[in-house]
């Protein structure tokens, strides 16, 4: 669709208002915050404000959505709306803030549609605390601010039945895993010096880290006897876990990816 003069004027003023909202950031931080189209990678050292950028980016997504990068005016926008925004840009009165944000928003996300993933529990707690201060407790509680494994567990507890598991699944620890593995090795009458339980478990763990299923692993074996047996063990191991309605730690992410790939909804 061809841009009109009204579109260009509206988009320019809207962008300026949104930039004004994040004027406390430096230029590079603000650029990252306002980038909403496609993936974004931020490389920065410790203490450079990465978490601040993440928090402010979430605020932008919640309040303005794609507004900063949208080139078109809303379909129902009027010249009066444009004049209002221009007046607000020049004199941002607090009592006009709500309407200005509404006129600048393009498909803003709802809090429960935002997911912010961290590596550690400490980082997740800090992120949640800062979100409470930034957007309020109610919205912060609705945002998915968790570690990878916590977020994946929440997804699995809700929808793992689509993979043939019950929602009451258990998570096997290292001792549970080893017990299952030893039983499998003995059932196959394999030399435990050649097929050490710990080494086999580590191999399977690496496969899961790389999102390689038992079937995919078996397809890569070719004429390698050792790998062929690992593929067989891997298949039996996953079958044993499923029969027990259990996952191991690596399955938490592996099964979540499988669930999302197989179910777009």
PLM features: residue spans?
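A basic/glycine-biased coupling hinge at the interface between accessory DNA-binding modules
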Residues: 2-19, 37-38, 59-264
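A sequence-level detector for short glycine-anchored, His/Arg-bearing signature motifs
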Residues: 29, 46-47, 120
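A cross-family signal for key residues in well-ordered alpha-helices
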Residues: 33-34
């Amino acid at each position: 669709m061809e841009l009109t003069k009204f579109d260009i004027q509206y988009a320019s003023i809207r962008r300026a208002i949104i930039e004004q909202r994040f004027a406390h950031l430096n230029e590079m931080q603000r650029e990252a915050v306002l980038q909403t189209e496609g993936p974004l990678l931020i490389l920065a050292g410790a203490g450079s404000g990465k978490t601040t950028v993440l928090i402010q980016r979430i605020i932008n997504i919640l309040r303005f959505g794609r507004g900063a990068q949208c080139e078109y005016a809303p379909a129902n926008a009027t010249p009066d709306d444009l004049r209002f925004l221009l007046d607000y840009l020049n004199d941002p009165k607090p009592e006009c803030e709500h309407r200005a944000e509404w006129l600048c928003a393009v498909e803003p996300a709802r809090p429960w549609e935002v997911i912010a993933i961290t590596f550690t529990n400490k980082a997740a707690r800090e992120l949640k605390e800062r979100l409470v201060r930034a957007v309020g407790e109610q919205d912060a509680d609705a945002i998915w601010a968790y570690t990878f494994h916590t977020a994946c567990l929440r997804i699995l507890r809700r929808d793992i039945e689509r993979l043939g598991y019950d929602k009451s699944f258990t998570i096997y620890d290292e001792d549970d895993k080893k017990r299952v593995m030893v039983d499998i090795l003995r059932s196959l009458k394999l030399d435990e010096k050649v097929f050490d339980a710990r080494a086999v478990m580590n191999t399977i763990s690496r496969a899961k880290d790389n999102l390689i299923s038992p079937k995919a692993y078996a397809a890569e074996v070719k004429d390698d006897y050792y790998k062929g047996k690992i593929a067989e063990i891997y298949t039996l191991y996953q079958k044993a876990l499923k029969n027990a309605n259990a996952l191991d730690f690596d399955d938490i992410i592996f099964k979540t990816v499988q669930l999302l790939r197989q179910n777009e909804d």
